[in-house]
Structures are given as C-alpha cells and as structure tokens.
C-alpha cells in the first residue's frame, strides 16, 4: 500500500456555529441526515461535532486534490454532501463516499482522525492505495 494524499483542516467552532444553521449558507445542504442526527445525540454542542465533520470533509477533499497535483480538478464544488462521516459503536470515525467521489476513490482506503480542543475542531485524512 502507498500513501497518495494527505489533507488537514482546522475549523473555528464559534465561527462555524454562527453559520451552520443559517439559511442560504453552504452548510444547509452539506451534512447528511445521519451526520445531523449523530451531532444532535451528543451531550455537548451539535455545532462542535459538525465542525469536526466539516473539517474531515475538507481534509478528504484536500488529500484528493493533492494526489492530483498539476492535474485539472475533476470534482464539482458542492461535493461535501457526498462525503459522509460516520462512527462505529465506539465512536471511531470513518468516511463513507457516494456519487462521483466514490467512483474516483473506489480503490482508495481513507483514514481519518478528528479532534476538538477549546474553540477549534480539526481533522486529518490520509488516502492509501493497495
């Protein structure tokens, strides 16, 4: 297996919280019903959990874009909804893809790590091929 892309993203939770539920923002169509449900089930702020998921989506896009260095982008700009962050019964995150990005990354394993510290959420994504 080989690493073909690495992406990282940081999100200011207070700034994200101001925008996440505003009509007309990019976030209104970004999260799947499952992601919104998981965030609302948590004991702390839903915005805190969604911010980490936004960071993960951005990290995956950056990892994929970096793997295509000097090549024309092939994904549309509203790809975020096709990147879903799910968790297993122990709360470990995993990325589930659909649509065009799933076709482009069909043979790629995506490793993702999310974190929150004070007012910041962050995520790292690593793309690996067999």
Curated annotation (Swiss-Prot):
> Where in the chain are disulfide-linked cysteines found?
none
Q: Which GO terms describe its molecular function?
A: holo-[acyl-carrier-protein] synthase activity; magnesium ion binding
Q: Which cofactor does it need?
A: Mg(2+)
**Gene Ontology biological-process annotations:** fatty acid biosynthetic process
Q: What class of enzyme is it?
A: transferase
The reply on keyword Ribosomal protein is no
Q: Which Pfam families match?
A: ACPS
Q: Where in the cell is it found?
A: Cytoplasm
Q: Could you say which EC number(s) this protein's record lists?
A: 2.7.8.7
Q: Which InterPro entries match?
A: 4-PPantetheinyl_Trfase_dom, 4-PPantetheinyl_Trfase_dom_sf, ACPS, Ppantetheine-prot_Trfase_dom
Question: Could you tell me what this protein does?
Answer: Transfers the 4'-phosphopantetheine moiety from coenzyme A to a Ser of acyl-carrier-protein.
Q: What is this protein called?
A: Holo-[acyl-carrier-protein] synthase
- Its source organism is Mycolicibacterium paratuberculosis (strain ATCC BAA-968 / K-10) (Mycobacterium paratuberculosis)
Whichever gene encodes this chain, its name is acpS
